[in-house]
């Protein structure tokens, strides 16, 4: 018998399988300020106690495996293991529990969202003891937050770059999203910016397809931006989607955008991946580019109520990885989003400090210290009649983005942009005068129609549009 084997035998190593809860369920544990805390919605298989299910999540997302192993004796599990420290039943749901897990900070590589997610959600979601598992929220300790650079610029720097204050920013996604030539695409960009929008946008799946290669699109969009700026005296931008098949190609596209002198580029951060996103955010910070983030694929991850990951976790991850804008739902419009829950993660994006508030889906108090904020983008099935509600719900620090609600105007793209700008300015003025947008919104829009035929035409087209499914 080797000396190593004798040593292990002397401390009582016993091969075999034992319950996770014997090691990883620790209700007496007091969390540390440096712990990463996770709130999981756990649905155990029939016959699996919640303590065992919660402990299994803690084990399989940290140091545990299915059986005891010799090498456990070569490290300190008490220092490195995850701990399920509290369990509470979910009100109104049978056999669902919120299990709180604490992870020591040493388990995670500094400045790497990729590593954080690989550990916490990388393997445990397929665990047989669980019918379903959802990560509802994370508390990122300040010690870990400070290892990330975060958004390239943030809200205040963006406003200073654009010289635009006191109102939400206005955007438009160019439609049809696929099939336009680069020149016709640039024409639509110009018309929307000339009509009064601050930004136009590539759709998330516009990359570099045969009908419109990326370099041609970038050139025509830059021409459109420069022409609109010269005619309006306002700083304009178009979210040039730099997402590509490789990180090298993505950075090459961002470099070309910088050389053209445009203010902002775009990335699909979930399909592109967090490593690519963080790399692009670092480039944008170093080279004065704003970074717009689209959340394409998010509903694959976050839509199911008992499995996957809530968008507030993806939003926190984006603030760490880096982005100046991110799509965040609308509350109104065609895409799903509950008001209080949506405002909960909107505050997590913008504010320096957010208090725990379960009514808004916030499980932990979160401090971002000096990390810049991210502008939430409201987009998806919205039009001029929604403007009062959007202004009231999202406030000034937001981007309100109308695709079909601009390009679907009966008189064309520029009048569609005019209608949206007039509606926004009317709502901001009414709010500043003390009027209640929630109660008087339709009246405010109708009053503005009297001196804007473009707005009146838009209101007539979309007066009956509702998304009720």
UniProtKB/Swiss-Prot annotation:
Q: Which Gene3D superfamilies match?
A: Ribulose bisphosphate carboxylase, large subunit, C-terminal domain, RuBisCO large subunit, N-terminal domain
Chain positions with N6-carboxylysine modification = 201
* Species name: Dianthus caryophyllus
The catalysed reaction is:
2 (2R)-3-phosphoglycerate + 2 H(+) = D-ribulose 1,5-bisphosphate + CO2 + H2O; D-ribulose 1,5-bisphosphate + O2 = 2-phosphoglycolate + (2R)-3-phosphoglycerate + 2 H(+)
Q: Which stretches of the sequence are propeptide?
A: 1-2
Positions carrying N-acetylproline = 3
Protein keywords: Acetylation, Calvin cycle, Carbon dioxide fixation, Chloroplast, Disulfide bond, Lyase, Magnesium, Metal-binding, Methylation, Monooxygenase, Oxidoreductase, Photorespiration, Photosynthesis, Plastid
**Cofactor(s) this protein cannot do without:** Mg(2+)
Q: How does it assemble?
A: Heterohexadecamer of 8 large chains and 8 small chains; disulfide-linked. The disulfide link is formed within the large subunit homodimers.
Q: What is this protein called?
A: Ribulose bisphosphate carboxylase large chain
């Amino acid at each position: 018998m080797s000396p190593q084997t004798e040593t292990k035998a002397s401390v009582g190593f016993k091969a075999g399988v034992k319950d996770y809860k014997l090691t990883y369920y620790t209700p007496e544990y007091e969390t540390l300020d440096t712990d990463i805390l996770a709130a999981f919605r756990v649905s155990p298989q029939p016959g699996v106690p919640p303590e065992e299910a919660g402990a299994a999540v803690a084990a399989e997302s940290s140091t545990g495996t299915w059986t005891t192993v010799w090498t456990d004796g070569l490290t300190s599990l008490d220092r490195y293991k995850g701990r399920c420290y509290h369990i509470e039943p979910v009100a109104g749901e049978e056999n669902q529990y919120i299990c709180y897990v604490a992870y020591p900070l040493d388990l995670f590589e500094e400045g790497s969202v990729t590593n954080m997610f690989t550990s916490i959600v990388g393997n445990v979601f397929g665990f047989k003891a669980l019918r379903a598992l959802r990560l509802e929220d994370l508390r990122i300790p300040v010690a870990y937050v400070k290892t990330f650079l975060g958004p390239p610029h943030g809200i205040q720097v963006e406003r200073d770059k654009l010289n635009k204050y006191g109102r939400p920013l206005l955007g438009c996604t160019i439609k049809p999203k696929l099939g336009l030539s680069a020149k016709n695409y640039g024409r639509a960009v110009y018309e929307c910016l000339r009509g009064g929008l601050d930004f136009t946008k590539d759709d998330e799946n516009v990359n570099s397809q045969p009908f419109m290669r990326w370099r041609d699109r970038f050139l025509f969009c830059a021409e459109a931006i420069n022409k609109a700026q010269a005619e309006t005296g306002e700083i304009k931008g178009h979210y040039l989607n730099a997402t590509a098949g490789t990180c090298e190609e993505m950075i090459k596209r961002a470099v070309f955008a910088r050389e053209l002198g445009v203010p902002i580029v775009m990335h699909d951060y979930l399909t592109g991946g967090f490593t690519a996103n963080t790399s692009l955010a670092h480039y944008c910070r170093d080279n004065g580019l704003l970074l717009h983030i689209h959340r394409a694929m998010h509903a694959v991850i976050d839509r199911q109520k008992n499995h996957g990951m809530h968008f507030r976790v993806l939003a926190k991850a984006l603030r760490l990885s880096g982005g100046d804008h991110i799509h965040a739902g609308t509350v109104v419009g065609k895409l799903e989003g509950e008001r209080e829950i949506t405002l909960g993660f909107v505050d997590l994006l913008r504010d320096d400090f957010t208090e725990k508030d379960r009514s808004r889906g916030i499980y932990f108090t979160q401090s971002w210290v000096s990390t810049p904020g991210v502008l939430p983008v409201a987009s998806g099935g919205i039009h001029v009649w929604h403007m009062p509600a959007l202004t009231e719900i999202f406030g000034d620090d937001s981007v309100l983005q109308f695709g079909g609600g601009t390009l679907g105007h009966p008189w064309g793209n520029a009048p569609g942009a005019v209608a949206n700008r007039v509606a926004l300015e009317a709502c901001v003025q009414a709010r500043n005068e003390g009027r209640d947008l929630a109660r008087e919104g339709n009246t405010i829009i109708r009053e503005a129609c009297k001196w804007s035929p473009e707005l009146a035409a838009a209101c007539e087209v979309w007066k009956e549009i509702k998304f009720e499914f």
